[in-house]
Amino acid sequence: MPTISQLVRKGRAKITKKSKSAALDSCPQRRGVCTRVYTTTPKKPNSAMRKVARVRLTNGKEVNAYIPGEGHNLQEHSIVLVRGGRVKDLPGVRYHIVRGALDTAGVEGRTQRRSKYGAKRPKK
């Protein structure tokens, strides 16, 4: 516990909060170009082929971003919109690609939680 005179001389050290999505530079989303689209396997208890893209953002940073939903149309040189949000069972994947924005198509045949996957309202 510091004395009052020590606090007058030095003051309290400010605790700086580290961003969980530093590559976005305090922006809600960023545009980027896919440099590689691939699948990878998740951590131990889970088993799947997760779809991931390596994206070069407009600020020059390269990130790994998850492609949500079933099926996608992304390939190298696709323009995508990247938002924050990590994938718990994929180490190093701290961003999500926004479905239904720019070159990324929405998920086909999706009827529930459509807005999260860029799917249009189905015809009756």
Curated annotation (Swiss-Prot):
<dbReference type="Pfam" id="PF00164">
    <property type="entry name" value="Ribosom_S12_S23"/>
</dbReference>
<keyword id="KW-0488">Methylation</keyword>
<keyword id="KW-0699">rRNA-binding</keyword>
<comment type="subunit">
    <text>Part of the 30S ribosomal subunit. Contacts proteins S8 and S17. May interact with IF1 in the 30S initiation complex.</text>
</comment>
<dbReference type="InterPro" id="IPR006032">
    <property type="entry name" value="Ribosomal_uS12"/>
</dbReference>
<dbReference type="GO" id="GO:0015935">
    <property type="term" value="C:small ribosomal subunit"/>
</dbReference>
<comment type="similarity">
    <text>Belongs to the universal ribosomal protein uS12 family.</text>
</comment>
<dbReference type="GO" id="GO:0000049">
    <property type="term" value="F:tRNA binding"/>
</dbReference>
<dbReference type="InterPro" id="IPR012340">
    <property type="entry name" value="NA-bd_OB-fold"/>
</dbReference>
<feature type="region of interest" description="Disordered">
    <location>
        <begin position="105"/>
        <end position="124"/>
    </location>
</feature>
<protein>
    <recommendedName>
        <fullName>Small ribosomal subunit protein uS12</fullName>
    </recommendedName>
</protein>
<dbReference type="InterPro" id="IPR005679">
    <property type="entry name" value="Ribosomal_uS12_bac"/>
</dbReference>
<dbReference type="GO" id="GO:0006412">
    <property type="term" value="P:translation"/>
</dbReference>
<feature type="region of interest" description="Disordered">
    <location>
        <begin position="1"/>
        <end position="24"/>
    </location>
</feature>
<comment type="function">
    <text>With S4 and S5 plays an important role in translational accuracy.</text>
</comment>
<keyword id="KW-0694">RNA-binding</keyword>
<dbReference type="GO" id="GO:0019843">
    <property type="term" value="F:rRNA binding"/>
</dbReference>
<feature type="compositionally biased region" description="Basic residues">
    <location>
        <begin position="9"/>
        <end position="20"/>
    </location>
</feature>
<comment type="function">
    <text>Interacts with and stabilizes bases of the 16S rRNA that are involved in tRNA selection in the A site and with the mRNA backbone. Located at the interface of the 30S and 50S subunits, it traverses the body of the 30S subunit contacting proteins on the other side and probably holding the rRNA structure together. The combined cluster of proteins S8, S12 and S17 appears to hold together the shoulder and platform of the 30S subunit.</text>
</comment>
<feature type="compositionally biased region" description="Basic residues">
    <location>
        <begin position="112"/>
        <end position="124"/>
    </location>
</feature>
<keyword id="KW-0820">tRNA-binding</keyword>
<feature type="modified residue" description="3-methylthioaspartic acid">
    <location>
        <position position="89"/>
    </location>
</feature>
<keyword id="KW-0687">Ribonucleoprotein</keyword>
<keyword id="KW-0689">Ribosomal protein</keyword>
<dbReference type="GO" id="GO:0003735">
    <property type="term" value="F:structural constituent of ribosome"/>
</dbReference>
